[in-house]
Amino acid sequence: MPHAHPADIDGHHLTPDTVAAIARGQRAAIVPEPVLGKVADARARFEQVAAANVPIYGVSTGFGELVHNWVDIEHGRALQENLLRSHCAGVGPLFSRDEVRAMMVARANALARGYSAVRPAVIEQLLKYLEAGITPAVPQVGSLGASGDLAPLSHVAITLIGEGKVLTEDGGTAPTAEVLRERGITPLALAYKEGLALINGTSAMTGVSCLLLETLRAQVQQAEIIAALALEGLSASADAFMAHGHDIAKPHPGQIRSAANMRALLADSARLSGHGELSAEMKTRAGEAKNTGTGVFIQKAYTLRCIPQVLGAVRDTLDHCATVVERELNSSNDNPLFFEDGELFHGGNFHGQQVAFAMDFLAIAATQLGVVSERRLNRLLSPHLNNNLPAFLAAANEGLSCGFAGAQYPATALIAENRTICSPASIQSVPSNGDNQDVVSMGLIAARNARRILDNNQYILALELLASCQAAELAGAVEQLAPAGRAVFAFVRERVPFLSIDRYMTDDIEAMAALLRQGALVEVVRGAGIELA
């Protein structure tokens, strides 16, 4: 059900969360009348300048390396339509419906600032499509990230004039013209500058990035939830999350929030050993000896102890990336731009380097989130590390039964895959367009890489979650779990039974990964009275 209050597309106050909500159909979008008035005024002033027959890029000139060609303004519509048709050359699988809708919202917001000098009708057509559920079919491959996301945005823009293809409800595509006829929607007739303004910007990478920020936010919370359950399965310690060590000693905001979450998730657990208890046990075992092994570890391995330092750093990275994306979202990333004082700016605001860097950074952070999860999974399964639990958490007939041995392999493989994918796309500039575009950002590639890593992580986390539940049950410790842990355990067991004998596991893993994609564990612990930061 859509949010009661539509979101304003005003060019200045849009947030990534709001873009995600509109993209997912949870909220409607409107352009306030004063904004449309400002856009109309800007267009009128721009038309006065253009009428003076002065050279304006993309209005009275060719595009890119063809800029030296004078084009009479009488050919304005043909020039814009030719631009869209020629740049509808994307290839590969299509972006999802939500991703394309996010692109459309981002582009509408950039145009709503007024500096791109389009008519209000252009923005209104984008919003009309959003409201009607008409979503362009946009191939994923083809953007260089400067001049913006030309190829994917061309596949969006071409549908506004009744050409190209749109997505159907069954996941296929249909000619835009047919769909518009069925809906009674009139195609837009472009005027000069408007085709260029629709595609010459960063709205594809920015729109996709808005969704990725939301995904990582839920993922880091669920990583903390699963880590807490793994700690209980291994009978570890919560002392490493003491507030003093974070709030006072190392006050990175993300680390502080992560440590607070771990304290909340582990509160009232009877499965954990404190530093005082471990110290006393060490002294008892040592007796009068001055140098002797006791078998008591008063500190645990880093994957159990440094959760706030690692996941907190992921949180801080997420915050930084969100700042960059929100700033880009509310920017005029077009060329040329036209200002209230009559100045024309021929520049390069279409360059997506900021978003490209941010998405590469997000990909690196997400990769490390997966790494620490996989290492805890290894600790749960290894008979040398799992606190005397059965090897590979096999419930019976160790040796005859393999337990979770095979389930570790996809997690290990996905870590290697993530490490390969997270190599920065933002440094992979390849000159193009007759060396006019001689340095490009590859920002949409960076966003697509980050998306793939985040999806891989859902499987890694699902495996850690299943192993943690198995460990708690094998240890006979379910009733000793913290309230959060018991709630999560019950949620999992309602869907995936205890691994008593070896069985086909793919369906179990897929089921858990699907629930993690929905952010299900955040709601589970909320139901247990815990609101995570």
From Swiss-Prot:
Catalyzed reactions per annotation: L-tyrosine = (E)-4-coumarate + NH4(+); L-tyrosine = 3-amino-3-(4-hydroxyphenyl)propanoate
The record's account of how the chain is modified after translation: Contains an active site 4-methylidene-imidazol-5-one (MIO), which is formed autocatalytically by cyclization and dehydration of residues Ala-Ser-Gly.
Keywords: Isomerase, Lyase
Active-site residue numbers: Y57 (proton donor/acceptor)
Cross-link 5-imidazolinone (Ala-Gly) residue location(s): A146-G148
Binding site for substrate: H87, N200, R305
UniProt entry tagged with the keyword Endoplasmic reticulum: no
GO MF annotation, one: tyrosine ammonia-lyase activity
PTM-bearing positions, type 2,3-didehydroalanine (Ser): S147
Protein's UniProt keywords contain Signal: no
EC number: 4.3.1.23, 5.4.3.6
Superkingdom of this protein's organism: Bacteria
Function statement: Has ammonia-lyase and, to a lesser extent, aminomutase activity. Catalyzes the rearrangement of L-tyrosine to R-beta-tyrosine and S-beta-tyrosine. Does not accept L-histidine or L-phenylalanine as substrates.
Quaternary context: Homotetramer; dimer of dimers.
Similarity comment: Belongs to the TAL/TAM family.
The protein's name: Tyrosine ammonia-lyase
Species assigned in the record: Cupriavidus metallidurans (strain ATCC 43123 / DSM 2839 / NBRC 102507 / CH34) (Ralstonia metallidurans)
Classification of source organism: Bacteria, Pseudomonadati, Pseudomonadota, Betaproteobacteria, Burkholderiales
